[in-house]
Amino acid sequence: MPNAQLIHTPNTRDLVVISDGTGITAEKFAHSLLTQFDIRTKTHRLPFIDTVDKAHEAVQRINDLASRAEQQPLIFTTLVNQELGEIVKKRARGFHIDLFNTFIEPL
């Protein structure tokens, strides 16, 4: 049986979902948005990122993905702790969408 891993094609992007909870809702939201575009994604959900050390580990994983991919990863975050969000925003190599600051904060 062939390897079930997704093979990257020019239209495949790494999608990284980072949350201080399970990340399930953020992942569903990200997939809903991305259905508007003709791209395939390989999803990497990083749940329970609730400490500075875990945020740095997440950044390292994202940057490892970015170094191997043709296109920058898409990063969707739902981190309540602003310090953790800033670590990801400033250090991760990818296109970052902070779902809390984009949608929740204006409410």
Please provide the spans of the model-predicted regions.
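N-terminal accessory targeting/assembly segments
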Residues: M1-L33
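Long, charge-dense
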Residues: F95-L107
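A general structural motif
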Residues: T12, E70-Q72
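Polybasic/polar functional segments that serve as interface/processing modules
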Residues: Q82, E86-K89, F95
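Short helix-loop-beta junction
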Residues: S32-T41
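Metallocofactor- and cofactor-centric catalytic cores in central/energy metabolism, strongly enriched
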Residues: I24, R45-L65, P73-L79, E83-L84
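Hydrophobic/aromatic beta-strand patches that form the interior of the parallel beta-sheet core
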Residues: V16, F76, F95-I97
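Conserved beta-strand scaffold positions in the cores of enzyme catalytic domains, especially
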Residues: T43-L46, G94-D98
